[in-house]
């Protein structure tokens, strides 16, 4: 799943550490989310969206995989 987390975080002038602290997660979690190595739980996705005042869909972009 793609996301705009890094773009949104930087636009707000936040460091990964600051966002992680606000969401009660590790900086490594934020880094992994931004790099697309980790998909958030639904609870974390809601927390991120609420923190930024956006919808989940404005941050996370779901793309269906094409079947072979």
Give the ranges of each region predicted by the language model.
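Short alpha-helical DNA-recognition segment
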Residues: 14-29
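Short, basic-rich loop-to-helix N-cap that marks the start of a DNA-contacting helix
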Residues: 37-47, 65-66
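DNA major-groove recognition helix of helix-turn-helix/homeodomain DNA-binding modules
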Residues: 43-58
